[in-house]
């Protein structure tokens, strides 16, 4: 019986993973001009790493393996009047490309929608199967 719900578990865990990915992308976009962070220096772009898991035949899905910080160096902009300017007058800004982030957001949204569609189709198919057993 549990095997019948495996597709729902895979889609449900994928929905959660894509939600975390969308939140991470939104944070990247929101911090595009953040010149300071709690860690020191400018905000660092973050990216979500996924992994599939198979604990046993009845427990499969998608996990977030880790959230990594982008290793690209910050952008330097000459602005000696900025409070975060270094001794040479340069301010370090996050190396975030908003177009790249928007493309990633669209991709994550499509993946989220695909999993919602899969859940709806599976739910409909399961309801029709139950209806057939009632005849």
Residue map of PLM features:
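Amphipathic alpha-helical polymerization modules
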Residues: 1-135
